């Protein structure tokens, strides 16, 4: 069997029907930024708040995805690209089911984030840059990863010996180095209410 033999199966419930029932649009909120910038913390806090207000929402977190779906991938540039490609495809499926998908991935390469944007309709991908200076992320270092990277124990670590390409025109910037978690979370929730309601 080849890819030509595989046919896309149309669902019996359309994205528009899901959105009508959910009373909100579906979208990917792609949180990107350095390790320790607060992506997962903000994503989960916003998801909780949105869920309590009746939104259909799911968080796809980089560490959690690497425990299952992407556990076969390392951290080379090619593996990072494949990691983002796979999660982009998963996020697209949730968007088709009327869900707001909040992702929390370093996703260091602009090209990879742009490829995910191309998977969904215009306006269904929102790049959220969780901005935080490297020195602040290193001071936070909640998982001890920066220390290990500085000691040479973790190769290809973003921000240390592998580059991070900042978004050029994100839909929203959350400066977690200057704002408290609650303020960043509130701004993300407000963004959803203003653009997806």
UniProtKB/Swiss-Prot annotation:
It holds the Pfam family APS_kinase. Signal peptide: none annotated. GO terms for molecular function: adenylylsulfate kinase activity; ATP binding. It is an enzyme of class 2 (transferase). The active site is at 107 (phosphoserine intermediate). Transmembrane segments: none annotated. It comes from the Bacteria. Keywords: ATP-binding, Kinase, Nucleotide-binding, Phosphoprotein, Transferase. GO terms for biological process: hydrogen sulfide biosynthetic process; sulfate assimilation. It catalyses: adenosine 5'-phosphosulfate + ATP = 3'-phosphoadenylyl sulfate + ADP + H(+). InterPro entries: APS_kinase, P-loop_NTPase. Its EC number is 2.7.1.25. ATP binds at residues 33-40. Pathway: Sulfur metabolism; hydrogen sulfide biosynthesis; sulfite from sulfate: step 2/3. Catalyzes the synthesis of activated sulfate. Belongs to the APS kinase family. HAMAP family: Adenylyl_sulf_kinase. PANTHER family: BIFUNCTIONAL 3'-PHOSPHOADENOSINE 5'-PHOSPHOSULFATE SYNTHASE, PAPS SYNTHETASE, ISOFORM D. This is Adenylyl-sulfate kinase.
């Amino acid at each position: 069997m080849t890819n030509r033999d595989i046919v896309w199966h149309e669902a019996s419930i359309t994205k528009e029907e899901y959105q009508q029932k959910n009373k909100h649009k579906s979208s990917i909120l792609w949180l990107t930024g350095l390790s320790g910038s607060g992506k997962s913390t903000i994503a989960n806090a916003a998801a909780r708040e949105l869920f309590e207000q009746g939104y259909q929402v799911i968080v796809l977190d980089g560490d959690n995805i690497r425990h299952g779906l992407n556990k076969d991938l390392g951290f080379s540039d090619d593996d990072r690209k494949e990691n983002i490609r796979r999660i982009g495809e998963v996020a697209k499926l949730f968007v088709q089911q009327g869900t707001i998908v909040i992702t929390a991935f370093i996703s260091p390469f602009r090209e990879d984030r742009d490829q995910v944007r191309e998977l969904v309709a215009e306006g269904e991908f929102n790049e959220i840059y969780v901005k935080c200076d490297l020195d602040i992320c290193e001071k936070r270092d909640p998982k001890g990863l920066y220390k290990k990277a500085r000691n040479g124990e973790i190769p290809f670590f973003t921000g240390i010996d592998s580059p991070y390409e900042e978004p050029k025109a994100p839909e929203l910037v959350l400066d977690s180095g200057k704002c408290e978690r609650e303020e960043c979370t509130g701004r993300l929730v407000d963004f959803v209410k203003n653009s997806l309601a």
